[in-house]
């Protein structure tokens, strides 16, 4: 836990035990930055500052939705900044604030263990560095909070820019026909969409919070303008995220159209192939019918000749005077009859 006083001459670090005396000062802004909300921090929040137990509990637990609680002498906010994780997952980096008359308490909410703890401190570290270098001298707790939250809004905007570059690359791959594995490409599209939706939600909720704070009459002089400025920053991030989301939706729809056309072309090619195979099968059947018909025609004379060639002892037909011509005529008649039948059935 860092206990700091910020005044015209710079920034100074103090012990936690000095907090009750420091809060009595009117010539400085008291800034308490809590990287991890442990038991000691909870005791300070509840015991020294006397914050509401629900607000203290929110600091100790992970909150997935931004919120604001307005109390008579201070304001409590829960904000989020995005951090891109592996495989397109978006981590919610939480920043809680208690903004009072002459103090600001920043609490960095619990984060996923896979996220570098330094990521949660980037906004407060950046503002601390500006104060230490003499580039920034906040005159009130609201001015100090404005600087920190503005850094958070810029991080949201930077996240949108990163996702936007990914969207442009995805569009180029779609229009260039270089999508590779379709399933993997679809996953990339929806990871980008997930990122834009996540940061859009963060910005929209944060903008609504600061829009509400800008309308409070209890905010000190100049504080309302600072709150309104932050609300505008979040609204701008939301608008940019909305625009990129619509742009990405166009890329997704175009890719779906490409997939549909490709599927139709493949189906058409398959239909042509099936038609070709059907025609080949039909032609083959026609040839088989012709072969079968001619085989039947030639089989009839062969049958008669086979009967006469049996050479049994008792075959009266062998001794008929007209046996031979009768056999020839019968062979001819059978052949002609079969030919006529097959011809009528269009087998020949």
PLM regions: where:
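N-terminal pre-transmembrane cytosolic regions of membrane proteins
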Residues: 1-60, 110, 119-127
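Short, surface-exposed charged micro-motifs
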Residues: 65-67, 94-96, 200-202
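Short secondary-structure boundary/capping segments
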Residues: 21-22, 67, 89, 96
């Amino acid at each position: 836990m860092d206990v700091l006083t910020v005044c015209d001459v710079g920034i100074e670090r103090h012990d936690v035990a000095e907090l009750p005396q420091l809060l009595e000062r009117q010539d400085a802004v008291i800034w308490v930055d809590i990287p991890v909300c442990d038991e000691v921090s909870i005791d300070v929040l509840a015991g020294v500052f006397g914050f509401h137990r629900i607000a203290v509990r929110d600091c100790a637990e992970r909150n997935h939705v931004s919120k604001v609680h307005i109390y008579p002498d201070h304001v409590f906010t829960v904000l989020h900044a995005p951090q891109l994780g592996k495989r397109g997952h978006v981590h919610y980096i939480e920043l809680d604030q208690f903004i009072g008359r002459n103090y600001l308490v920043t609490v960095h909410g619990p984060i996923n263990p896979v996220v570098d703890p330094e990521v949660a401190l980037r906004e407060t570290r950046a503002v601390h560095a500006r104060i230490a270098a003499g580039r920034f001298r906040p005159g009130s707790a609201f001015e100090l909070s404005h600087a920190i939250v503005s850094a958070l809004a810029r991080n949201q905007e930077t996240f949108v820019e990163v996702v936007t570059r990914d969207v442009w690359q995805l569009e180029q791959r779609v229009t260039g026909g270089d999508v590779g594995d379709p399933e993997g490409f679809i996953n990339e599209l929806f990871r980008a969409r997930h990122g834009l939706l996540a940061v859009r939600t963060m910005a929209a909720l944060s903008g609504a919070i600061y829009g509400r704070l800008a309308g409070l009459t209890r905010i000190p002089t100049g504080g309302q303008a600072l709150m309104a400025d932050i609300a505008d920053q979040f609204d701008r991030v939301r608008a940019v995220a909305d625009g990129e989301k619509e742009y990405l939706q166009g890329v997704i729809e175009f890719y779906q159209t490409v997939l549909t056309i490709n599927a139709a072309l493949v189906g058409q090619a398959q239909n042509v192939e099936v038609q070709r195979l059907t025609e080949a099968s039909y032609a083959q059947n026609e040839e088989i019918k012709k072969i079968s018909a001619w085989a039947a025609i030639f089989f009839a004379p062969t049958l008669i000749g086979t009967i006469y060639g049996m050479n049994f002892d008792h075959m009266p037909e062998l001794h008929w005077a007209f046996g031979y011509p009768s056999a020839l005529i019968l062979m001819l008649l059978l052949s002609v009859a079969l030919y006529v039948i097959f011809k009528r059935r269009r087998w020949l």
